Amino acid sequence: MEARKIIITGGATRIGAAIAKKLSGKEIEILIHYNKSKSKAESLKKELQKKGSKVFLVRGDLSKEKDVNKIIKFAKSKLKFFDCLINNASLFENDKIENFTTDSWGKHLRTNLRTPALLSKMFARNIKGKNNNIINIIDQRVFKLTPFFFHIL
């Protein structure tokens, strides 16, 4: 049997790390994306390898197109094809209506919307078989902005 191949964005900490731990084991290859959590990613890699998983780490800022392209290229070179993509990474800066910037707004949209779509497109082009999954995890703040975002008192 060929190994199952999983990509997890934002996989080094919190929910992403918990998912990686739950899915890891023999015959599992996991590519973990991280941005700023290098030491946590490296520690998680060691933990998952002890459970029998083959683990790859890739760093990248999901708001930057060149980093997203690098992640896609790395994923293709290491895994060849994919069984599961978990779009878990997100960006939520603490801002309010009176101080948010168009740069911040754009970074949020690129990280939380555009990049999961681009990664899903790449995934769809590199699947093998029929039992493949894309799981999109989104924070509640997309639906409910920072408390009092539009409240000025």
Question: At which residue positions do the language-model features occur?
Answer:
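Conserved NAD(P)H cofactor-binding loop of Rossmann-fold oxidoreductase domains
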Residues: N88-E93
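Active-site loop of short-chain dehydrogenase/reductase
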Residues: R4, S53-K54, F81-F82, N126-Q140
